[in-house]
Amino acid sequence: MAQFDTEYQRLEASYSDSPPGEEDLLVHVAEGSKSPWHHIENLDLFFSRVYNLHQKNGFTCMLIGEMFELMQFLFVVAFTTFLVSCVDYDILFANKMVNHSLHPTEPVKVTLPDAFLPAQVCSARIQENGSLITILVIAGVFWIHRLIKFIYNICCYWEIHSFYLHALRIPMSALPYCTWQEVQARIVQTQKEHQICIHKRELTELDIYHRILRFQNYMVALVNKSLLPLRFRLPGLGEVVFFTRGLKYNFELILFWGPGSLFLNEWSLKAEYKRGGQRLELAQRLSNRILWIGIANFLLCPLILIWQILYAFFSYAEVLKREPGALGARCWSLYGRCYLRHFNELEHELQSRLNRGYKPASKYMNCFLSPLLTLLAKNGAFFAGSILAVLIALTIYDEDVLAVEHVLTTVTLLGVTVTVCRSFIPDQHMVFCPEQLLRVILAHIHYMPDHWQGNAHRSQTRDEFAQLFQYKAVFILEELLSPIVTPLILIFCLRPRALEIIDFFRNFTVEVVGVGDTCSFAQMDVRQHGHPQWLSGGQTEASVYQQAEDGKTELSLMHFAITNPGWQPPRESTAFLGFLKEQVQRDGAAAGLAQGGLLPENALFTSIQSLQSESEPLSLIANVVAGSSCRGPSLSRDLQGSRHRADVASALRSFSPLQPGAAPQGRVPSTMTGSGVDARTASSGSSVWEGQLQSLVLSEYASTEMSLHALYMHQLHKQQTQAEPERHVWHRRESDESGESAPEEGGEGARAPQPIPRSASYPCATPRPGAPETTALHGGFQRRYGGITDPGTVPRGPSHFSRLPLGGWAEDGQPASRHPEPVPEEGSEDELPPQVHKV
């Protein structure tokens, strides 16, 4: 089992944001005063149902929607069986003559029912087909299971319906016009009246998000740390990403809720996974479980594949007939949705961001049409269109032309060909501006590798972005291939990472009082998971492998603070937000250099400063991007970056009329009303429509504010990276040996122990020759606490890392050892208590 060695260390809880005296609070309520919603045991499921009912626009819409899902499954199975066994295709294709007349010389008119077999013949053909009977039995069992689940869900959601009516006081007719922030604010208030959770006197917005997104946060962290096998290098195709709904379902089945999963229930990780003494045994158990689930997927592959093909055919056949170019459209891939998702971001919040970025993303990808392909498409459209025009003209002259064999088929195929060819012909009025489009995309999706900036016109950037924003046809093809590929990925790619996954859940799980076991990354704690290149320098104590990649901790914290302005962040997060606010003020003040003549004047840049609070919020982003793109080559690259940062800071300051005059120190700037009341959580108006309109407008301002912060933080990150290029690590790609470690050779004296074991997925710092004393202190502390440094005793010095040829990271000038330091099977590690994160 030496191949399972990995380098994770225990991550201790960092802070407590519970009110003084409530760390171990257990609220007691007299028996007679208990409400129906007092002490709900499974709050994860309860809050998830509350959220789902809100997103499905009420009980009636949810009920009808699930009924149609049952009917849809039944229709697909029944209609497919009818087409296979109850249709005489010889009559349908006119290979067999049917005569309804008593006189053979009279003309025959075949009707559609003539091709239907009698019920007795149809039943006999079904009974003779053994494979069809097997498929129908399996489909019937599955449908009955879904029917029972539907009835159970209806009973459960009726309780949620009552909760909305009586506890939250929101009628179902008004629910479609209430934002989630309004519902969430009423849940927080309901906790004070009904004590939904007895372990805390008050619920916070973060508590509710943790309950709803517990497993989703783990998935985002696993993708962020590149622990799931999603990237593959194929001959002739290069590096590809494969992540489908079926593969994601299997990941969640294995890790979260399936039989033998890592979690005891929805809110608690099993006790044995919280300690390191049995890590190898647990990894072997997980590896075996992955193997059996992979074998089960392989056995069920034919049935799943048939269902995928039938469902895709019935779903997209009509769309292709109506819009042949639909498959040429693009959509956000499942990997892109997981990669771009913030910690603690609900599904509708993510969808809203991606919807805003869809049009600029489509325009960006359309900039890369091949000139040769365009030439072929123009000529193909000309030839196909010419033939199509002649056939249409003949049909208009005499409609009997359609009665000629294959004429209608030819017309249809030619129409599809013309439509497809036109999709490859660019708009003659389109302007090629990939850098500007990529910056607009960044404003909405918030995440982007550094090497994309300045290289938006390169095909490599386009290919990497296509992994996030793929063709609809590629999405359908991947879903069709998923039943075949998923068992192979589980058996041959996921199993070797069993120990890394076990260590990940042990080291990055904290127990939050009143919430349960959550992913520590979801705490958005810049001290434990911040990155020094993302404005967290001096505020983070995280080692390299404890840092979240791509600035996800910092951007997630900013997004959550803007989305939930009533949330009180912990001390370290408050300091980070306060520092960022001060930096925005300084850079915004520096934007006045344009009026002083020190920098070239720009009309678009000047228009930003004249924007008022009632202006269209999205115009701020357009002005910032356009102003930064129109300066020309007269400015140096560094000066352009500084001016762009000043533009964004000036745009952020334009939100000041919406902010209250006296905001708490460290609070993030929020879109608020002039009276200081957060209108995103409590809309008011003379009617439901006025309140809904006000909520939507303020939501747009909040989204624009976050977009500007994303641009600003990326610009700061870029400048800090250029200042210390040797320290920057972005998007650490997996190697062929990721997840595997070589077996140990020799004894303890064969090599010098490393402070942090190295792996193929995470870089680590090794002792530098120039600082032996500091390294000794730092290494000794890291060996015990996984790289967390005491800020009061051990200063953090800059580290220099280089990529190893076969994966992994080592410090410049130091030899890379292939043997990580072993984690003891028994002993002191097993004596450590489970982590308790008091919130």
UniProtKB/Swiss-Prot annotation:
Region Disordered, as annotated, extends over 657-686, 717-839
Q: Where would you find this protein in the cell?
A: Preautophagosomal structure membrane; Cytoplasmic vesicle, Autophagosome membrane; Golgi apparatus, trans-Golgi network membrane; Late endosome membrane
Record note on disruption phenotype: Lethality; mice die within one day after birth caused by impaired autophagy. Mice also show aberrant activation of the innate immune response. Fetal mice display significantly retarded growth. Conditional deletion in brain causes axon-specific degeneration: mice were born normally, but half of them die within one week, and none live beyond 4 weeks of age. Defects are caused by impaired autophagy in neurons, leading to progressive degeneration in the axons and their terminals, but not in neuronal cell bodies.
Annotated membrane-spanning segments are 62-84, 129-154, 372-397, 407-424
Alphabetically, the GO molecular function entries are: phospholipid scramblase activity
From its record, what is one biological process in GO terms? autophagy
Query: What is the recorded membrane topology of this protein?
Result: Multi-pass membrane protein
Residues with PTM N-acetylalanine: 2
Q: Which residues lie on this side of the membrane: Cytoplasmic?
A: 2-61, 155-290, 302-319, 329-371, 425-470, 481-483, 493-839
What are the record's GO terms for cellular component? autophagosome; cytoplasm; endoplasmic reticulum membrane; endosome; Golgi membrane; late endosome; late endosome membrane; mitochondrial membrane
Q: Which UniProt keywords apply?
A: Acetylation, Autophagy, Cytoplasmic vesicle, Endoplasmic reticulum, Endosome, Glycoprotein, Golgi apparatus, Lipid transport, Membrane, Mitochondrion, Phosphoprotein, Transmembrane, Transmembrane helix, Transport, Ubl conjugation
- Does the keyword Endoplasmic reticulum belong to this entry? yes
According to the record's subunit comment, the protein's assembly and interactions are:
Homotrimer; forms a homotrimer with a central pore that forms a path between the two membrane leaflets. Interacts (via cytoplasmic its C-terminus) with ATG2A. Interacts with SUPT20H. Interacts (via the tyrosine-based sorting signal motif) with AP4M1; promoting association with the AP-4 complex. Interacts with ARFIP1 and ARFIP2. Interacts with ATG4A; the interaction is direct and promotes ATG9A trafficking.
State its role: Phospholipid scramblase involved in autophagy by mediating autophagosomal membrane expansion. Cycles between the preautophagosomal structure/phagophore assembly site (PAS) and the cytoplasmic vesicle pool and supplies membrane for the growing autophagosome. Lipid scramblase activity plays a key role in preautophagosomal structure/phagophore assembly by distributing the phospholipids that arrive through ATG2 (ATG2A or ATG2B) from the cytoplasmic to the luminal leaflet of the bilayer, thereby driving autophagosomal membrane expansion.
Q: What does UniProt say about this protein's domains?
A: Forms a homotrimer with a solvated central pore, which is connected laterally to the cytosol through the cavity within each protomer. Acts as a lipid scramblase that uses its central pore to function: the central pore opens laterally to accommodate lipid headgroups, thereby enabling lipid flipping and redistribution of lipids added to the outer leaflet of ATG9A-containing vesicles, thereby enabling growth into autophagosomes.
Protein name per the record = Autophagy-related protein 9A
Q: Which organism is it from?
A: Mus musculus
Q: Which gene encodes it?
A: Atg9a
